[in-house]
């Protein structure tokens, strides 16, 4: 009951942030009008909009395929349908919570309810998270090397978000590697930080959080050992997570071309969206609402006449439609599982 209330509050916060963000960006843009937005949608290429929708689904699909690869490799195979369901659960709750990994506990619980062991579930989710992080850093690096001008076009605020987002991703990778090779050092640093947070009254129960910390470090170490000896699995999961990142980035590119953007500037649009995704890790905001929008508009204002309309359409497909789709999948699964649960209780 407590978790349900907390999730409901996060959902309400997401809705409030979304409404506020839309109101701010539409009211502050001199070139935006609702009539113009509807005109843009009605004149958009159906083919490119279809491609954008397929790419949006790819964000859910490829994460699921990454989970399926790991589970199958570790001897606990899952179907494609269940893999997509676990992915949808992870994405849905990650969008509601401030953390990009906020959906993992919910996905872990669902996987365990379907018979996947806790160890395999945890490793599959963690491996996906690591490869997901490596993927965006790789894509961002390529964009910076190939088209550095995009970064230099952005204003100071957008650059700060992107730099913080990159630092957060690098720190996560460093922490993961250190857990593999120097577990004692990581534990000492984390213990110091935890004590400091407790003294600052940010955390209240040291022992409870310390136990969680030990569990996380143990999972990281198990996953790291797996990575060192299972190169084929590593490459497969990396590929699927790379495709997941590319899918969500390509939504913006397809929308850009679909509404009349010059195909010759497609990589510029790709770079702008890539940096928006990277910057989304800068602050603990549900769905990175406001941050992604700000960086997107900053990058696309040099590419299209009406960046707000393009942003609303692109973000609507890549984030909000995906959120609704994932929510529907979980609701359908809940309805299907409820009769079975009832029968089990009757038995």
What residue ranges belong to the model's regions?
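Transmembrane helical segments that form the transport core of multi-pass membrane transport proteins
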Residues: 224-278
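Membrane-embedded helical hairpins/re-entrant loop segments and their flanking transmembrane helices
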Residues: 64-88, 255-272, 296
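Alpha-helical transmembrane segments of multi-pass integral membrane proteins
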Residues: 52-59, 90-97, 132, 240-244, ...
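Membrane-interface helix starts
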Residues: 8-9, 43-52, 225-239
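Alpha-helical transmembrane segments of multi-pass membrane proteins
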Residues: 81-90, 267-278, 306-316
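Transmembrane helix-loop-helix hairpins in multi-pass inner-membrane proteins
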Residues: 1-39, 93-203, 285, 289-347
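Extended non-transmembrane interhelical loops and adjacent amphipathic helices
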Residues: 72, 84-115, 207-221
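A short amphipathic helical element positioned immediately N-terminal to and/or at the very start
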Residues: 35-43, 216-228
């Amino acid at each position: 009951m407590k978790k349900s209330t907390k999730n409901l509050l996060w959902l309400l916060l997401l809705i409030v942030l979304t409404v506020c963000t839309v109101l701010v960006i539409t009211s502050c843009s001199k070139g935006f009008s609702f009539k113009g937005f509807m005109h843009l949608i009605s004149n958009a290429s159906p083919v490119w909009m279809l491609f954008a929708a397929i790419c949006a689904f790819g964000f859910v699909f490829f994460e699921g395929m990454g989970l399926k690869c790991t589970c199958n490799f570790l001897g606990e195979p899952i179907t494609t349908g269940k893999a997509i369901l676990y992915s949808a659960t992870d994405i849905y709750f990650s969008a509601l919570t401030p953390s990009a990994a906020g959906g993992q506990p919910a996905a872990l619980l669902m996987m365990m309810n379907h018979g996947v062991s806790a160890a395999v579930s945890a490793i599959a989710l963690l491996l996906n998270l690591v490869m997901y992080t490596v993927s965006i850093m790789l894509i961002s690096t390529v964009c910076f090397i190939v088209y550095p001008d995009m970064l230099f076009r952005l204003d100071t605020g957008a650059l700060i978000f992107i730099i913080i987002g990159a630092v957060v991703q690098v720190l996560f990778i460093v922490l993961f590697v250190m857990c593999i090779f120097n577990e004692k050092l990581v534990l000492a640093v984390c213990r110091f930080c935890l004590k400091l947070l407790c003294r600052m009254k940010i955390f209240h129960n040291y022992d409870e959080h310390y136990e969680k910390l030990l569990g996380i470090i143990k999972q990281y170490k198990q996953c790291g050992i797996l990575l060192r000896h299972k190169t084929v699995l590593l490459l497969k999961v990396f590929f699927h997570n790379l495709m997941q990142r590319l899918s969500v980035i390509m939504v913006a590119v397809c929308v850009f071309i679909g509404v009349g953007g010059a195909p010759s500037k497609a990589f510029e649009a790709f770079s702008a969206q890539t940096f928006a995704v990277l910057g989304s890790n800068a602050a603990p905001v549900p769905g990175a609402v406001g941050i992604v929008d700000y960086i997107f508009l900053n990058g696309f204002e040099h590419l299209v006449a009406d960046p707000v309309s393009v942003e609303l359409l692109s973000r609507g497909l890549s984030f909000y439609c995906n959120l609704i789709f994932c929510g529907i999948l979980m609701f359908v699964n809940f309805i299907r599982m409820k009769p079975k649960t009832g029968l089990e209780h009757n038995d």
